Amino acid sequence: MEVNKASLTYDVPEDREYATKRILSLKRPSKIMVIGDVDTGKTTLIVYLANELISRGFKVAIVDADVGQKGILPPATISLALADMKFSSLSELKPLIHYFVGSITPSQFFGEMIVGTMRLSEIGKKFADYVLIDTTGMIYGSGVELKRLKIEAVKPDLILALEKKEELNPIVSGFEDKTIKLKVSENARSYSRSERRQIRQEKWRKYFENAKIVSFSLENVVVTGTSLFQGSDIREEEKSLLERLFKWVILHGRRIGDKYFVVKADVAEVPRVVDKNVVRYFDFEKLSNLLVGLLNEEGLCLGVGIIKGINFGEKRIDILTPVSEIENVREIRFGRIRVREDGEELGILDREAL
């Protein structure tokens, strides 16, 4: 299967020329956000516009915020790349930096989606004349509010809305003065959920193909995105009581406020009734192959990794990652998707699970 859904084409609707002229009329540097449903050609439009601007001698920055169908690797992040030469696909661009989201869907991660897009677009303005912002196809339900909040935060100078039947009106209402509605190209192809997963699997595989296992001391990095190290250690008598009550082996436990949070393994298959208002628990085996972001001192993501082992007693974590600037890692942020290095996705965890 073709790994890149979008590539450069000049077989485009006539309104693309008008959109290009509007972009050229903007005061530089400027930010242009592209929105639309899934399979409406958002990334194809980004590639086309970038090449048109580059051919006129302008520097272009691209913010790839389509976390589930990334052109700029890896998935589950928002990425910034700079382009000063013509290209055919986003996959050809070398990322400058990422913002870690930790999931392949925006659901439950609105904060990361908005902050990441805002931060990277502002960085892009420092290096380029135009910042082109690609987005997810989440435009219904809570997706309306996500897009509106993103527009409020990012403050794009122009919004390009790819729509078929005014489905984007709830999003662009109030922003009409800086919105251009564009036709969806007749050449836009639809992809099934299975095809999207296969494409993403190949992208994961490619990203991790030269990865190595790196061991980190949990005392030398900040750990975020999880409750694992919040609060204080549970006492030995509390641990023993919980183990007897629920037939668990507790490998790690914390007291967070008036609640317990434990990492456990079952020692027997028995029915359990656990009041989650008192005890939150997480299966130790689900930490294996969990995606994490490796962040620098500015909270920006150098790349991602997969947990291959964690020793709570020795306070060490082993992570498979292609990131080479390990000395710049200051923070490890836990994500909510489990994935193997061969690209096979093992499932998405709820935001509150960890």
From Swiss-Prot:
Enzyme class per UniProt: transferase
Instruction: Check the record and name the Pfam families matching this protein.
Output: CLP1_P
Q: Does the keyword ATP-binding apply?
A: yes
| EC number(s) per entry | 2.7.1.78
Entry's Gene Ontology molecular function annotations: ATP binding; ATP-dependent polydeoxyribonucleotide 5'-hydroxyl-kinase activity; ATP-dependent polyribonucleotide 5'-hydroxyl-kinase activity
Q: Which domain of life is it from?
A: Archaea
The record ties this protein, via InterPro entries, to: Clp1/Grc3, CLP1_P, P-loop_NTPase
Reactions performed catalytically: a 5'-end dephospho-2'-deoxyribonucleoside-DNA + ATP = a 5'-end 5'-phospho-2'-deoxyribonucleoside-DNA + ADP + H(+); a 5'-end dephospho-ribonucleoside-RNA + ATP = a 5'-end 5'-phospho-ribonucleoside-RNA + ADP + H(+)
Q: Which GO terms describe its biological process?
A: RNA processing
Q: Which cofactor does it need?
A: a divalent metal cation
- Keywords in alphabetical order, please: ATP-binding, Kinase, Nucleotide-binding, Transferase
Q: Where does ATP bind?
A: G36, D37, V38, D39, T40, G41, K42, T43
Matching PANTHER family, A to Z? CLEAVAGE/POLYADENYLATION FACTOR IA SUBUNIT CLP1P (PTHR12755), POLYNUCLEOTIDE 5'-HYDROXYL-KINASE NOL9 (PTHR12755:SF3)
Functional summary from the UniProt entry: Polynucleotide kinase that can phosphorylate the 5'-hydroxyl groups of both single-stranded RNA (ssRNA) and single-stranded DNA (ssDNA). Exhibits a strong preference for ssRNA.
The name of this protein is: Polyribonucleotide 5'-hydroxyl-kinase PF0112
Organism encoding this protein:
Pyrococcus furiosus (strain ATCC 43587 / DSM 3638 / JCM 8422 / Vc1)
